[in-house]
């Protein structure tokens, strides 16, 4: 590793140092040896003790005014993630250099300081990106035009193919879908459907595929808002095949469960793990039969230090037989019971307090208060108030199912391995949360379908970088001290400054900044 020279400013005086990186085998991280070279005199290091008097005179402190200051630290770390995953290479192979830089700027903005597109230019001017790519135009109109161009092109698909090939994605894929709402009336994909956030707005459905082993999203797709999860699987399987991925395990929640999807997965020889949706009568019967002896000690296992029962089952579909496990989790059962009973108690108390007005509709008031739990109550109106009782049979039937669920699978999985892989879906749930909160994708404010597609590609790229950074932070033991946001705030204080005389300096690192970069094996 080559040494680098840098200027450190102490008490307003500039000093030259030579820093040589080396690998510390004991701490398993990159560290630096620092060697003093001398005072900065006209851009050169000078040892003052042996310097002539005229040099000492010239070296007396002068007020060097700072012309500009730029965020360098947070840009450095995100750029290092891009380079590690070769994302910059994939972009530059698909786009002219200026447009690849524009994509990078937009993606970094969603991670560091998500803001309206009209404000991105102001943010960009305060970052080190402005020094590297001063030529890019970040006017609001230019961004909209570029996102539209990106959205109508096949660049996102080509980028995805390169990403999948470059990461060697082939093993375990986690598939899920979420809703993205919008106020716009100009996006053709927007339709009303089941909204996972409870928003009464038209929406787009966004599917995401995560590479479990790399911990990053590798593929996404967009569907009209009215298309249910279960109907998206067939097209997604074809896309996965088109990208050359074979011999993988697909992990899906109950939203994708249907007999046709089970048959298609089996017909294509795809290994999968999928939660069952217990609405079909034969599946209800299957669980009822399984739970008769599911708490037998021979089915007892331990998962995450807690006892759990898992009983092998089979399910016949036409001429095919699907393997599965029926699970009984006593801890989950208790949590679900307490949650339901607390909810029913609170609703009952709220209803008892209600005093009905003369012109009010009791049924409407009741439905508003019970929030979807109406089937658990008997009620009538007496004078101006509700007489309410909880239906014991309804509660007992619901409690009988608590803590119990079925996972179907194809492949060679034991009960705990099957459950462990299914629980990895938490990663994709966190990714959706990042998209909607940290990356600030909602509500969609684009004014056309093409622009929306372009913006979602930017958000997808941001999510790749952010999830990879989280994986790096976890491996380095930094997640106990920092969130992504706090880590980037610490590194924002590492600045590049330009002086009035044209010099460019990097400010001295704080102890926390040095610890972060060393833990991540990065050099400033």
Map each language-model feature to its residues:
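Acidic, metal-coordinating catalytic cores used for nucleic-acid/nucleotide bond scission
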Residues: 251-260, 278-281, 450-452
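Active-site beta-loop-alpha junctions of metal-dependent nucleic acid enzymes
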Residues: 221-243
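Secondary-structure transition/capping motifs at alpha-helix termini
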Residues: 25, 127-135, 153, 166-169, ...
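An anionic, glycine-rich sequence signature occurring as long contiguous blocks
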Residues: 202, 222, 269-421, 475, ...
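Short amphipathic alpha-helical "interface-anchor" segments enriched in bulky aromatics
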Residues: 418-445
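Dynamic "connector" segments at or just before major functional cores
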Residues: 1-189, 206-219, 226, 234, ...
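Basic, amphipathic alpha-helical segments enriched in Lys/Arg and hydrophobic/aromatic residues
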Residues: 448-470
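Conserved structural-core and active-site-/substrate-pathway-adjacent residues in large, well-folded domains
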Residues: 18, 120, 174-176, 215, ...
